[in-house]
Structures are given as C-alpha cells and as structure tokens.
Amino acid sequence: MAQTLAQTKQISQSHTFDVSQSHHKTPDDTNSHSVIYSTQNLDLWYGENHALQNINLDIYENQITAIIGPSGCGKSTYIKTLNRMVELVPTVKTAGKILYRDQDIFDQKYSKEQLRTNVGMVFQQPNPFPKSIYDNITYGPKIHGIKNKKVLDEIVEKSLRGAAIWDELKDRLHTNAYSLSGGQQQRVCIARCLAIEPEVILMDEPTSALDPISTLRVEELVQELKEKYTIIMVTHNMQQAARVSDKTAFFLNGYVNEYDDTDKIFSNPSNKKTEDYISGRFG
C-alpha cells in the first residue's frame, strides 16, 4: 500500500523555488528540522474583507505548531490556505506564496488533489461518515485505487493503531461510526486521515467539542504523531498550546503578531499584545 500511495504522490518537480530569501524564518534558525511550509507575503480577501495580511511564517517538519489568537483573527482561514480548502469560498482571492517542499501551491500546475493527499485535516467537530468504522478508514485508500481486501484490512489496523484506538474498536469495525463517543469519533477521524499517509496534519480546534478526558487522549496522541507527521493546530485553549506545541504563532487582526518557540511565547513574549492575550486581558 505504501508503494501504491507513494506512486500517487509524485508531484512535478518542474516548478521549484529558492526559499533561502524568506524573511521570516522560524525563531530558532539552528533548528535541525527542515522547513516543510514557507508562507511568504500572503494576503487573502473574502470579497472586500482583508482577512490575512502579509503573513510570513515557516513551519518545520515533525513539530507541532500551535496557531492561537482571538476569534476572527484569521487562524482557521490560514490553515485552510495550506491545503487550499479556502478556495471553496467563491469570493476568496489571494496574493503571495505558500511553498510546500519548495513548490508554490498556488501555481496553476500544482495539483490540489495531490496537495490534499499530502496534507490531511481534522476538523473542530468530529465528522465521521455515516458508515462503519471500517468503511470510514478505507474510504481514502479506495479512492486511490486500493481494492485488495487484505491490504485494506492492514490499512485499517495500522491507521487505528496510529490513532491509539485499535484496542478499543478492533471488535467493532463494522459498527456505525456514529455510535461512538465524541472522543472516539475524533480519533477515528484522525485514523481516517492517517490512512492516506499524509505528511502534514492540519487540526482546527480538534478538542473543543470533547470532554476533558477525551481531550487529554487526543493531546497525548498528537504528541505521539509528531514523530511521523508535522502537526499544525488551531486552538483557543492557551493551556493546550503550552502543553503540546513546539512553536506558537499568535494571530491578531489578520496579522502574525508574534511567532516563536512555545516556551518563550508563554514565559517571555516579545510583544505586549501577545502577553495581554495569553494572560487573558483580552480575547
């Protein structure tokens, strides 16, 4: 299966870009992790609403980057540009570049479908399909042409193990996913995402609808997943960002107000507005 999906993930290398001049590198330039996403001078409009303004941000491989900020600041809009889901909004327009592995995802020759294979997404509300757990997990691989039952069985087990829920569900694979608890549904959605072997997982408030115990399980899972995946997570929960992330970007009014190592953001922020936000003075 890995070979089959790898074959589907070959993107043309004919349009590459030098990212060495990107003027907003991650705060720790000695970091051994490679840049996987480089956002350069990104502006985005919904009609006349200038939702993102001059965003410059580098995301590093195999790290968890938290995106924080008050409601309406552009957090969710930003991560939806990273897999071009934002283009589902008819009035949207963009300027600037987002480089994914040195290729501009807005280039006309860049495949949106391939991008969304490489970059999975988990939403705020658990959104399993109205199908069995098994069919939820195999949905993506089947779209990619995998039909062999043995291979699909292996994908299901591997994905559910990756989402730390195999032992809970291995005897219930043909149960409707809607019958699960909210926390279990969200982990099934994470497993469904893992089944297509992405490199990056975008998470938009993945625990906001969950109880504290389920939230803790998802947070523990996210920290395990960064060994194999790059995680970019929007959260309103300051404690969550501080607990799980390596880097934190604070968005305010469509701008990146501050971006730094999470420890520094929460212990010694450089910007007064960042300090005011994380201390609860506004937001």
UniProtKB/Swiss-Prot annotation:
SMART domains: AAA. GO terms for molecular function: ATP binding; ATP hydrolysis activity; ATPase-coupled phosphate ion transmembrane transporter activity. Residues 37-278 form the ABC transporter domain. It is found in: Cell membrane. Its main location: membrane. ATP binds at residues 69-76. GO terms for cellular component: plasma membrane. Its EC number is 7.3.2.1. It catalyses: phosphate(out) + ATP + H2O = ADP + 2 phosphate(in) + H(+). GO terms for biological process: phosphate ion transmembrane transport. Keywords: ATP-binding, Cell membrane, Membrane, Nucleotide-binding, Phosphate transport, Translocase, Transport. It is a peripheral membrane protein. Residues 1-20 have a biased composition (Polar residues). InterPro entries: AAA+_ATPase, ABC_transporter-like_ATP-bd, ABC_transporter-like_CS, P-loop_NTPase, PstB-like. Gene3D superfamilies: P-loop containing nucleotide triphosphate hydrolases (3.40.50.300). It comes from the Bacteria. Residues 1-32 are annotated as: Disordered. Belongs to the ABC transporter superfamily. Phosphate importer (TC 3.A.1.7) family. NCBIfam families: 3a0107s01c2 (TIGR00972). Part of the ABC transporter complex PstSACB involved in phosphate import. Responsible for energy coupling to the transport system. The complex is composed of two ATP-binding proteins (PstB), two transmembrane proteins (PstC and PstA) and a solute-binding protein (PstS). PANTHER family: ABC TRANSPORTER I FAMILY MEMBER 17. This is Phosphate import ATP-binding protein PstB. It comes from Staphylococcus aureus (strain MRSA252). The gene is pstB.
